[in-house]
Design a protein with these regions (language model features):
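Core catalytic lobe of class I
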Residues: 1-257, 273, 287-290, 294-313
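Post-kinase regulatory C-tail/linker adjacent to protein kinase catalytic domains
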Residues: 274-285
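C-terminal helical cap(s) of enzyme catalytic domains, especially alpha/beta-barrels
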Residues: 259-270
Length: 313
């Protein structure tokens, strides 16, 4: 444990059966980002991914990914969890339901589907609604893609709290604060992505995601796995939350990046995002500013000047 292995996670001989409590990871995007090319030259990664190891076909990609999570199932202890951050993919005019197809395969392998959480990126996404604005007729509707899925799977077995004595449970309390009640408690999480070029990796997920998942699905001292370690976000957070960690990454540059970042301070942002709802007349013209038509839902407090929480309409 507490190591990053530089080889594929298709086989993880370093890990014994049932040795991992939780996996938090995000598989490579299918046909979206060329990680190899980015590793060679940060400025050169493309929206089309041509895999050198031969799984550029969608079915091959799904089978390859499912094979890795079959190995993850082996090393997960009974009752342990696996959190996967994954989104749908647009490619050559088609919209591929990657999260749903992968879920079907993982359930067939023996994973129990536990929860789905929607990651609302808030400030980033694939902008497509312009088509509808330019041609406002049925059949031209293509919504902006502002979300990814956080899929939670569980290995059959006793509930994890039943294997932890009462005193040890008290060492891993979940913070029940305003952020929890207004965001974490729901299955839609409003988390801004990592700003571009902040890390030398094309698509790191924000540290808030592994922070929440590790806090919610594991206890202090347990082991956390990331089979697609990338920039080391999961491993870094696991260490700070006093969990053991183990990662797998095939690109040596990213292994070195992860090893460096693990000891860095957490980058959890001081101000987190929540959704504050407001009412607007259903037929208000686009772009029209008529504050008199916007009515706040009773019971919601107004924003103060120091409140950096945006309102999502």
């Amino acid at each position: 444990m507490n190591k990053i292995h530089c080889h594929s996670s298709e086989e993880m001989p370093e890990l014994m059966d049932g040795s991992v409590s939780l996996t938090v990871t995000s598989p490579p995007y299918w046909n979206a980002i060329d990680y190899d090319r980015h590793a060679e030259n940060k400025g050169q990664y493309f929206r089309t991914r041509n895999y050198s190891n031969g799984f550029d076909d969608y079915e091959n990609y799904l089978n390859w990914t499912a094979k890795i999570f079959e190995e993850v199932l082996r090393v997960t202890k009974p009752g342990g969890y696996c959190g996967i951050v994954i989104g749908t993919v647009l490619y050559n005019g088609r919209h591929y339901p990657v999260p749903f197809d992968l879920t079907s395969r993982l359930v067939r392998e023996g994973w129990e589907f536990h929860q789905d959480i929607i990651w609302h990126k808030c400030t980033a996404g694939v902008k497509r609604a312009g088509v509808t604005i330019q041609k406002p007729y049925p059949g031209y509707y293509y919504p902006n893609i502002m979300t990814e899925y956080i899929l939670i799977f569980r290995k059959s077995g006793p509930a994890i709290y039943k294997t932890i004595d009462v005193e040890d449970r008290k060492k891993s309390p979940i913070a029940i604060n305003k952020l929890f009640t207004m965001d974490v408690a729901n299955n839609i999480w409003h988390i801004a992505p990592v700003p571009p070029d902040l890390l030398d990796h094309p698509c790191p997920f924000p540290e808030e995601i592994p922070y929440r998942l590790i806090s919610l699905y594991s206890y202090t001292g347990e082991s956390v796995l990331d089979p697609f370690a990338g920039s080391g976000q999961t491993l870094k957070v696991a260490r700070h939350l006093k969990r053991k960690f183990v990662g797998y990454e095939i690109i040596e540059k990213y292994v070195k990046l992860s090893e460096k970042r693990i000891a860095e301070p957490l980058a959890i942002r001081e101000y987190q995002l929540i959704a504050e709802f407001a009412k607007i007349h259903w037929d208000t013209p686009s772009g029209e500013r008529q504050s008199s038509q916007v009515k706040r839902i009773p019971g919601r407090r107004k924003k103060s000047p120091k409140n950096l929480t945006p309102t999502f309409l």
